[in-house]
Amino acid sequence: MLAKRIIPCLDVRQGQVVKGVQFRNHEIIGGIVPLVCRYAEEGADELVFYDITASADARVVDKRWIADVAEVIDIPFCVAGGIQSVAQAGEILSYGADKISINSPALADPTLISRLADRFGVQCIVVGIDTWFDAASGRYQVNQYTGDETRTHITPWQTLDWIEEVQRRGAGELVLNMMNQDGVRNGYDLMQLRQVRERCHVPLIASGGAGTMAHFLSAFRDAQVDGALAASVFHKQIINIGELKQFLAAEGVEIRLC
């Protein structure tokens, strides 16, 4: 059995780490490199970086800080933000990223997934999915351009259908960003995760809602996800990654200990 992964998420805007609630009202957390060093020291398995306004601004992620991150850590990291071509992805990987993630650009052009997978291998291609539960319809819907409140909109894709589509096109890993739970710290949406797990045959990462160590345990034990991503509980030092891993190991979760 592969070890479960603990993954801090760093939303980046204008060269700084920020964090919002339900993808809105972002506050500045601090500089990228100091947080990166702290998470690596605490025992993070990998890191994910989202340049949250890149797609909405029609630009690609700033590569200068990617090189800075690669210089100071030796754990894998994934970068997302406005990647719309094979050439752009290759450049980001050349600066030191281990994986690239696409979200809104994949919705705009689903063939991008297969082109990237063909060029770099499926193990390198992550698709992020921003999913919102619409109480009126009772459905989970995929959202696009969520880094810009003025441009965020619901797409025609229902989440489970998009899950299957991106796998057909070559996604090697999925990150499910559960927008209703984001930043609220009331736990992951286990019902949605279980539904997605039934359709998802590649590694699945849960994102949105972690507030306690027990929430991570529930995601691993009850939804069988491969990794758990979180931001605010790590940024604000509510949970220490090393202590979280000790807790999970004591509960029988296969996890890499420092």
UniProtKB/Swiss-Prot annotation:
Molecular function in Gene Ontology: imidazoleglycerol-phosphate synthase activity; lyase activity
Pathway: Amino-acid biosynthesis; L-histidine biosynthesis; L-histidine from 5-phospho-alpha-D-ribose 1-diphosphate: step 5/9
Active site: 11, 130
Name of the protein in its database record: Imidazole glycerol phosphate synthase subunit HisF
Localization: Cytoplasm
GO cellular component, one term: cytoplasm
InterPro entries with a match to the protein in the record: Aldolase_TIM, His_biosynth, HisF, IGPS_HisA/HisF, RibuloseP-bd_barrel
Biological function: IGPS catalyzes the conversion of PRFAR and glutamine to IGP, AICAR and glutamate. The HisF subunit catalyzes the cyclization activity that produces IGP and AICAR from PRFAR using the ammonia provided by the HisH subunit.
Keyword terms of this UniProt record: Amino-acid biosynthesis, Cytoplasm, Histidine biosynthesis, Lyase
The keyword Cell membrane appears for this protein: no
Underlying gene: hisF
Subunit structure of this chain's protein: Heterodimer of HisH and HisF.
HAMAP family: HisF (MF_01013)
Family to which this protein belongs: Belongs to the HisA/HisF family.
Alphabetized Pfam families for the sequence: His_biosynth (PF00977)
Top enzyme class: lyase
Reaction equations catalysed: 5-[(5-phospho-1-deoxy-D-ribulos-1-ylimino)methylamino]-1-(5-phospho-beta-D-ribosyl)imidazole-4-carboxamide + L-glutamine = D-erythro-1-(imidazol-4-yl)glycerol 3-phosphate + 5-amino-1-(5-phospho-beta-D-ribosyl)imidazole-4-carboxamide + L-glutamate + H(+)
CDD domains in the record: HisF (cd04731)
Origin superkingdom: Bacteria
